[in-house]
A protein has these predicted regions:
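A common structural junction motif
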Residues: 270-279
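Non-catalytic, polymerase-adjacent accessory regions of viral genome-replication enzymes
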Residues: 1-58
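Reverse-transcriptase-like RNA-dependent polymerase core
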Residues: 63-84, 98, 182-204
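Conserved polymerase palm-domain catalytic core
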Residues: 138-249, 253-268, 283-290
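Conserved pre-motif C helix in the palm subdomain of viral-like polymerases
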Residues: 86-116, 209-238
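Active-site-proximal segment of RNA-dependent polymerases
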Residues: 6, 15-19, 104-162
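Glycine-/proline-rich flexible loop or hinge segments
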Residues: 36-47, 79-90, 114-118
């Protein structure tokens, strides 16, 4: 019988407040410009802003404080990563990329503090190599408990992230209406892209709901994508008591003693994905022996 998911007693998320004023602080904006322009000094936009940085940064500050900031139109292009073509969304350097850096410089510690130690994507000092090392360490040092592996990921993950649910998650973490306004503006900004291009995208993506999706390429998106899964991480670790669990964005690996327990767990994960995250498991999930 599947576990009751909605009534599970997951610890309350820590809430943070008074962050918007830190984002708008001119020193934070100066730092954001410094970080955002790394490796991009040849950009015409960067060179223009560098002639009088504070003039432009004060414009961003005014947009934020007055709530007149609106996400610019996206440039959409395709990138072949060797397995498939991915749609990448690119925003102008000014004001958008500076703005997103200013946000992440303040909220990144809050997001990371909410994640378990079992997730490795978009986190400083973790990454794919550390994830692989941890998996290898588990298999070699605890072979009896890691005889079988469940491997799965979400179908069309970035395209399927539900806007309302993501905004709700941020609202639970940030007791700051102005910060929530700013995050909402960026989360919903995919609707400001070219309508014809969006229509083509959704036709290509079959049953992708046009009310969902965050843009691959946005600096904020990689953190939002990681944060969206945080409740699942806590459920797996604290309610299901899964010891050998590893997540890199939506790619999930779980080790266990028997095939049967992983098959049963996969059924429960399927329910959690649908009911709590509004996602679907991709059809190529596997359970297989590790040795």
């Amino acid at each position: 019988m599947l576990t009751e998911i909605r009534n599970c007693n997951i610890p309350k998320m820590k809430r943070y407040d008074h962050l918007f004023e830190k984002i708008c602080d001119i020193e934070n904006l100066r730092k954001a410009h410094k970080n955002a322009k790394k490796g991009k000094g040849w950009y015409k936009e960067v060179q223009e802003i560098d002639k009088d940085p504070d003039k432009y940064l004060e414009q961003i500050q005014e947009m934020l404080i007055n709530h007149t900031y609106r996400t610019s139109e996206y440039e959409v292009f395709y990138k072949d990563d060797g397995r498939k073509k991915r749609k990448i969304y690119k925003l102008p350097y000014f004001p958008d990329r500076i703005c997103q850096w200013a946000i992440l410089q303040v909220i990144e510690p809050c997001i990371i503090n909410n994640l378990t130690t079992d997730t490795y994507s978009a986190i400083p000092d973790r990454g794919i190599h550390k994830a692989l090392h941890k998996m290898q360490d588990a298999m070699w040092n605890h072979p009896e408990e890691c005889k079988y592996c469940l491997k799965l990921d979400a179908r069309h993950y970035y395209q399927s992230i539900n806007h309302d649910l993501l905004k709700e998650k941020y609202s639970r973490m940030f007791n700051d209406s102005e910060l929530v306004w700013l995050l909402t503006e960026i989360i919903d900004s995919i609707q400001t892209a070219d309508i014809e291009d969006l229509t083509a995208i959704y036709l290509l993506e079959e049953d992708v709901d046009p009310e969902t999706g965050i843009p691959i390429g946005n600096y904020l998106s990689q953190y939002s994508g990681n944060f969206y899964f945080s409740s699942f991480d806590h459920w797996i670790k604290e309610q299901k008591h899964i010891r050998y669990y590893f997540r890199y964005m939506d790619d999930i690996v779980i080790f266990a003693k028997t095939k049967e327990e992983l098959v049963e767990l996969r059924k429960e994960i399927d329910v959690y994905f649908r009911d709590e995250l509004k996602l679907n498991i991709k059809g190529n999930w596997q359970v297989f022996p590790t040795f």
